[in-house]
Amino acid sequence: MLEYPQSGERTRGRRNIQNQRASQPSKKRFTVRRIIGGGDLWITEFVLTYDGKPSYTVSIVEFRGDKVARETQYFADPFVAPASRAQWVERMDT
């Protein structure tokens, strides 16, 4: 099962997930920032770039045995850091 809570979509079944992902017309690129987890729960943080536009993405993957039982993905567009926080923060490479 693949869920996109932000758009309210749920895709069931491996073939449907494969077809849904293969049918996307955009050119995509993935840059993995980190993968953490253990046992039946793994989280991937990556930048998904569609046609040159980056989206910061978190993918939560739940396993049942050696198969993916559920993947939930969240997407966020980059934004300009406000000047009001500048004195407390340091800039990150993105």
Model regions and ranges:
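C-terminal and inter-domain tail/linker signature
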Residues: 1-94
